[in-house]
């Protein structure tokens, strides 16, 4: 059985999807971008600010299930420019801050929704 996850304090989905799905002890988030939930707009700044906000948005989705960032086992990161990889690494370092890093893949793409510079999908365990 699967359960849709759409917490009210996370950014609203910009398409026909749920923010996440919980099934059989696993949580899968849809791709998140650096939208500020209070404005519905991408945060100002570059890749570093968008990466930080994207990770916060994932944290909000997980916290709606009483899960923390330590439950994250895999992240798939999509960036518009692989030259931004060091900024993504720094955002991850700040976000995970002493917690073991999850597995991760990073892929360069030509475009992302809303002109975002980064999008992240998450798999977590309950």
Q: Which residue stretches match the model-derived regions?
A:
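Short, polar/acidic, helix-capping and beta-turn segments at strand->helix junctions
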Residues: 2-126
């Amino acid at each position: 059985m699967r359960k849709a996850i759409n917490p009210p304090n996370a950014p609203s989905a910009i398409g026909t999807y749920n923010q996440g799905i919980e099934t059989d002890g696993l949580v899968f988030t849809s791709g998140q971008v650096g939208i500020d939930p209070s404005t519905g707009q991408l945060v100002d700044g570059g890749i570093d600010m968008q990466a930080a906000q994207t990770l916060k948005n994932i944290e909000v989705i997980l916290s709606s299930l009483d899960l923390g960032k330590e439950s994250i086992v895999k992240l798939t990161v999509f960036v518009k420019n692989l030259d931004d990889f060091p900024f993504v690494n720094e955002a991850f370092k700040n976000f995970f801050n002493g917690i073991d890093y999850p597995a991760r893949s990073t892929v360069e793409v030509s475009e992302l929704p809303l002109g975002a510079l980064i999008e992240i999908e998450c798999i977590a365990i309950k």
